[in-house]
Design a protein with these regions (language model features):
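Von Willebrand factor
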Residues: 54-117, 122-162
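Short, Lys/Arg-enriched charge-dense amphipathic segments
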Residues: 45-52, 113-129
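Surface-exposed acidic, glycine-flexible loop patches that form ligand/cofactor-binding
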Residues: 44, 50-55, 92-95, 154-162
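Acidic, polar low-complexity linker/tail segments
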Residues: 2-62, 69-76, 88-89
């Protein structure tokens, strides 16, 4: 993390190359059928969000998604529209300095993959990584967003906090 910036043209290219549409189903957008090991906390030591010459004052932002069956409509909205809108708004309003986003997917306690976390990114890679997440699409009422909080508290190294 720490290099590049996000642009509307990057989003347009990604959306076109993946044929993304808000009329698609969760399974059409999130095509993985198992958790990618690079997003599985079991295989992640630390996620870093460091300042760089290009981004000297990074502001970490985590977008957490409930990936249980009942929330599929929201994941589609985030993947096809809302993430792009959020990032464009952050850049156009300069609401925060040097935004670096991480996407996280959390499900039920008993899921195969109750938590997945991307890298912190400041460019189109965040949208690409979001689309690589596994949407488990189950649900038994034991959603665990607290596993995300635990991960963030123990497995991140963030300059904005360390300063």
């Amino acid at each position: 993390m720490g290099y590049g910036s996000y642009s509307a043209s990057d989003w347009s290219r990604l959306k076109s190359s993946r044929n993304l549409s808000d009329t698609q189903s969760v399974d059409e957008i999130f095509q993985r059928r198992a958790c990618n090991p690079k997003f599985d906390p079991k295989f992640i030591g630390t996620r870093e969000c460091f300042d760089s010459e290009e981004h000297p004052n990074t502001t970490p932002i985590v977008v957490g998604l409930d990936v249980t069956a009942s929330m599929g409509y929201l994941a589609v909205e985030v993947a096809t529209k809302a993430l792009n809108q959020l990032i464009m708004k952050l850049y156009s309003t300069a609401a925060v300095e040097d935004p670096a986003l991480m996407c996280a997917a959390y499900g039920d306690f008993g899921d195969f993959s109750p938590l997945q976390v991307t890298q912190f990114e400041s460019d189109i890679r965040i949208a690409e990584q979001l689309l690589e997440l596994y949407f488990e699409n189950h649900g038994c009422g034991e959603v665990v967003p607290t596993c995300l909080w635990e991960f963030l508290s123990k497995h991140t190294n963030i300059d904005a906090i360390n300063k």
